[in-house]
């Protein structure tokens, strides 16, 4: 049964110093490049345990130079979300990187735990810039040595509430 009074049963005994324990703004020119790297890309951390005390997420940026690609890798038990800010990403994934899909500015990419994958800058002229968020407070990167297929299958994922754009 609910209460008819207003108070928090879990309130801390001492007042919280919200200046110290509240919102933190991390400036774009103050990102930390001392984070696990994968050949072909540059990662920089904005949010992690060491910098801001994050308990359950890691966030940062990734830049892939024109016509470059990363080595194959996965992120252990972590889920990853990539948001494409600028440029065009070509993702490959699978045991032999046998699947591919592309994403552009404004698109989100979800990478489940333990999925071997590779990010490719689909442009020969412009950098690919993305925001990256992972489901733990530290970056986990396991670089892999994979024999990739020569011609991966293009996959267009359709969620349960949206139609495939070619089904109109």
Summary of predicted features, one role per range:
Residues 69, 78-105, 115:
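A short beta-strand-loop-beta hairpin characteristic of the jelly-roll/cupin
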Residues 98-99, 120-128:
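Short conserved catalytic/interaction loops centered on acidic-Pro-aromatic/His motifs
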Residues 1-56, 71, 141-168:
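A short, N-terminal "cap"/entry segment at the start of jelly-roll beta-barrel domains
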Residues 51-52, 77, 96, 124-125:
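Short strand-connecting beta-turns/loops that link adjacent beta-strands
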Residues 55-57, 75, 103, 122-124:
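Short glycine/proline-enriched turns and hinge-like loops at secondary-structure junctions
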Residues 59-62, 81, 110, 125-143:
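A short hydrophobic beta-strand segment most commonly corresponding to one strand
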Residues 65-67, 93, 103-123, 133-135:
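Conserved metal-binding segment of the jelly-roll/cupin
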């Amino acid at each position: 049964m609910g209460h008819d009074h207003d108070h928090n049963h879990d309130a801390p005994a001492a007042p919280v110093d919200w200046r110290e324990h509240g919102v933190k703004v991390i400036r774009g020119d103050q990102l930390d490049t001392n984070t696990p790297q994968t050949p072909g890309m540059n990662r920089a951390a904005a949010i992690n345990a060491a910098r801001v005390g994050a308990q359950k997420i890691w966030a940062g940026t990734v830049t892939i130079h024109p016509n470059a690609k990363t080595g194959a890798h996965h992120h252990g038990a972590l889920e990853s979300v990539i948001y494409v800010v600028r440029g065009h990403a070509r993702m490959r994934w699978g045991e032999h990187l046998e699947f591919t899909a592309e994403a552009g500015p404004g698109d989100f990419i979800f990478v489940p735990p333990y999925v071997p994958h590779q990010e490719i800058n689909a442009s020969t002229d412009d950098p690919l810039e993305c925001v990256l968020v992972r489901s733990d407070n530290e970056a986990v990167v396991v670089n892999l040595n994979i024999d990739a297929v020569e011609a991966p299958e293009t996959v267009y994922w359709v969620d349960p509430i949206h139609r495939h754009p070619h089904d109109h």
